[in-house]
Amino acid sequence: MAKGEWKRSGADDLPLPGRSECEVFDDGTNTFFWRAHTVTVLFILTCALVYVTLLEETPHDTAYNTKRGIVASILVFLCFGVTQAKDGPFTRPHPAYWRFWLCVSVVYELFLIFILFQTVHDGRQFMKYIDPKLGVPLPERGYGGNCLIYDPGHPTDPFHNIWDKMDGFVPAHFLGWYIKTLMIRDWWMCMIISVMFEFLEYSLEHQLPNFSECWWDHWIMDVLVCNGLGIYCGMKTLGWLSMKPYQWQGLWNIPTYKGKIKRIAFQFTPYSWVKFEWRPASNLRRWLAVLGIIFMFLLAELNTFYLKFVMWMPPEHYLVLFRLVFFVNVGGVAMREIYDFMDDPKFHKKLGQQAWIVAAITVTEFLIVVKYDPNTIMLPIPFFITQCWILGIALILVWTLWRFFIRDITLRYKETRRRRQEVSSERDGSSSAPSGRSKLNGSMDSVRHRKS
């Protein structure tokens, strides 16, 4: 292709049915940045191993050598995966970036499986190899407390209860729901997950003390302010991404420095954009898929709190932050693969690799919680809360039966009855036409007979 010639992307050359995808124009530039560099990575890896083998003296510290050997094994696996793993649906800022997080997902799942197969004591004490400060019970903290918005008992600062809630978790909630909105790309699903999680906190506050919050902290601070504002900003960003022109040109083909800087900045934006149209009420398959997505989202959210509790990790520990960063990077790819698999199963015949491993991670985390502290999760839920959940599940089942079975059967019956009526009316019309002709012929014969 000639230099500077624009072409449409392959995704637009073969549009998938029912897809809402923006048009992409690319000049086809394939620079050193985009190549796989498999030989280069293999050469660097070999040089590092040769250096460790021949030039570096191995220390006589069993614990240190064990840790270093495990880290080296993980790094070799990451090098292999980054260069050889299959590409996912995302290509920006670079396909290798998303291959890296796919391999990190595999490593994390293997780590969870290892923890799952340990005893409760050994699993908690194993965390000391990662951080010597871990492996000790968490101190008890007080939650809930005074829930007055305006406290007349503190005349100097009557709104102290509100200011006490203004900590680092407020921007974390906002940023988290902003990113979740970019993953899900649907306002209704985001709001349902946000409200449902608050109901879960209400229902499980007898198991985890940090779920015990004031009513205004649940519904005003969380749902309306933090989550709601994050969802609103996320939807505005989605609107901009859906309207943004996707025209890509090689960096060295851009004449001005301003254009080059702008091109570098846009490297961290999507290559193309697909608007998610979940349409859960369109058929039973999509309805069950959306319910499954909401369930897995809520389970992953609960795992965040329960894992900290059963593994004795304080909320401010860096491993908790690393887990959140991990899900931020793998969640978007997993949601895109789930949507592709659900929206066009004929083209995407199997669930994507990132979605598969994320689902396995979520289930494994929950199994660790079940094994390490079954007494906590088996604490009986209050009866009135159980009644509310039974009522909600019953309403979902009734609506599902009505929408996808009773309603469809009724519509099919009405359509069949209408067609039968049309067929019978056509038959009556066709039978009445010959009888009319015979009467007319009979009257003409009688007239001729009289004339004769």
From Swiss-Prot:
One of its GO terms (biological process) is phosphatidylserine biosynthetic process. It holds the Pfam family PSS. It catalyses: a 1,2-diacyl-sn-glycero-3-phosphoethanolamine + L-serine = a 1,2-diacyl-sn-glycero-3-phospho-L-serine + ethanolamine; 1-hexadecanoyl-2-(9Z-octadecenoyl)-sn-glycero-3-phosphoethanolamine + L-serine = 1-hexadecanoyl-2-(9Z-octadecenoyl)-sn-glycero-3-phospho-L-serine + ethanolamine; 1-hexadecanoyl-2-(4Z,7Z,10Z,13Z,16Z,19Z-docosahexaenoyl)-sn-glycero-3-phosphoethanolamine + L-serine = 1-hexadecanoyl-2-(4Z,7Z,10Z,13Z,16Z,19Z-docosahexaenoyl)-sn-glycero-3-phosphoserine + ethanolamine; 1-octadecanoyl-2-(5Z,8Z,11Z,14Z)-eicosatetraenoyl-sn-glycero-3-phosphoethanolamine + L-serine = 1-octadecanoyl-2-(5Z,8Z,11Z,14Z)-eicosatetraenoyl-sn-glycero-3-phosphoserine + ethanolamine. It is an enzyme of class 2 (transferase). Residues 430-444 have a biased composition (Polar residues). Keywords: Endoplasmic reticulum, Lipid biosynthesis, Lipid metabolism, Membrane, Phospholipid biosynthesis, Phospholipid metabolism, Transferase, Transmembrane, Transmembrane helix. The chain crosses the membrane at residues 36-56, 70-90, 100-120, 287-307, 309-329, 350-370, 377-397. It comes from the Eukaryota. It is a multi-pass membrane protein. GO terms for cellular component: endoplasmic reticulum membrane. Catalyzes a base-exchange reaction in which the polar head group of phosphatidylethanolamine (PE) or phosphatidylcholine (PC) is replaced by L-serine. Catalyzes the conversion of phosphatatidylethanolamine and does not act on phosphatidylcholine. Can utilize both phosphatidylethanolamine (PE) plasmalogen and diacyl PE as substrate and the latter is six times better utilized, indicating the importance of an ester linkage at the sn-1 position. Belongs to the phosphatidyl serine synthase family. This is Phosphatidylserine synthase 2. It comes from Danio rerio (Zebrafish). The gene is ptdss2.
